[in-house]
Amino acid sequence: MKRTFQPSVIKRKRTHGFRARMATKKGRQVLARRRAKGRHRLTV
């Protein structure tokens, strides 16, 4: 059985990156929530 985590910087950025978050309304809500909480890193 292969491992489920096969790291790839491209996939990581495309699914969880800042621009990916900004692209949807829900993604912007995620960023707003993380800003309100005071996270130093909003995205990966």
Curated annotation (Swiss-Prot):
Highest taxon listed in the record's lineage: Bacteria
Protein encoded by which gene: rpmH
Entries under PANTHER family matching the protein: LARGE RIBOSOMAL SUBUNIT PROTEIN BL34M, MITOCHONDRIAL RIBOSOMAL PROTEIN 34 FAMILY MEMBER
Species whose genome carries this gene: Psychrobacter arcticus (strain DSM 17307 / VKM B-2377 / 273-4)
Record protein name field: Large ribosomal subunit protein bL34
A cellular component annotation (GO) from this entry: ribosome
Ribosomal protein as UniProt keyword: yes
Keyword field contains Ribosomal protein: yes
Family: Belongs to the bacterial ribosomal protein bL34 family.
Annotated keywords: Ribonucleoprotein, Ribosomal protein
One record GO biological process: translation
Positions of region (Disordered): 22-44
GO molecular function: structural constituent of ribosome
PROSITE patterns: RIBOSOMAL_L34
